[in-house]
Amino acid sequence: MKFFAVYSASLLLLFSCISHAQDAPFVRFNDGPGEWQGQLQTAIHSYRDSNGRELNLVSAIHIADAEYYSLLNEFFKTQDLVLYELVAEPDQRPGPESNVAGSSPLSLIQNLVARALDVEFQLQQIDYTPANFRHADLSPAELGRIMAEKDESFFTMVLDVAIAQQASAQSRNQQQGEVSISSLLMALSSENQSQALKYLLARELGRAESLLLDPQLEENLTLLGDRNRVAIAALIDALAETDKNAISLFYGAAHMPGLERVVLELGFKASDQSWLTAWAIQ
């Protein structure tokens, strides 16, 4: 179904949850004990190099429960350096309760959806002001210039991802899209309609771990590939600093497969994995 392919791709780009089929996913959904209950979770993957330095790939979902962001804020206090994702000028550092909505269309949409789902928006919960935080992303002007050079828009990226998803699903004889018309109608007729719709959305986002997105397509998408290159450049600079022994790359889950490939090429080896609950639906 082409509609569900476009629908799914839109969600995954919007909430930064595209991943790849792999042994260690960066986002997952666990069903709960009751109807319309479950947990959407993101991973922290830890790696070490031959010098004993620790690198953490901290996956994020940009709208989530307040407790999720509170746990991340506490974790970041333990790090020597946090390289963070944010399309903004390097000197723009949101703090909790700053009422920053984000200047990009994606951020504005995410903020609106957060309100509708009764969850929090990342830029209003994560504290980016500590001295150990360092910007590792494009500026709005840089992002706009690169997308213009590629004649790229959010809509064209959605279509590219949707086509890739549909081809992947067909190659594995799987039905494209988990959200069917019947499940949507059931959610709309539920006594707790809001929770039911949130459950369906969380399940779709968690399904990202089973998607097969071609690495070449990922590299070519400005929202993924070009921004990942900026993050990796910042990481390489940080690794040259002798006092940075615990480093976190804090990026949306969509970016993590590409970042992990380079991290492994740099000589880091996987050492640990933990999960945080972004949405507790109950």
Which ranges hold each PLM region?
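Structured, acidic catalytic/metal-binding patches in enzyme active sites
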Residues: 22-226, 266, 272-281
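Bacterial N-terminal signal peptides that target proteins for export
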Residues: 1-8
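A cross-kingdom marker for long, charged
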Residues: 221, 225-282
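N-terminal signal peptide c-region/cleavage motif recognized by signal peptidases
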Residues: 16-18
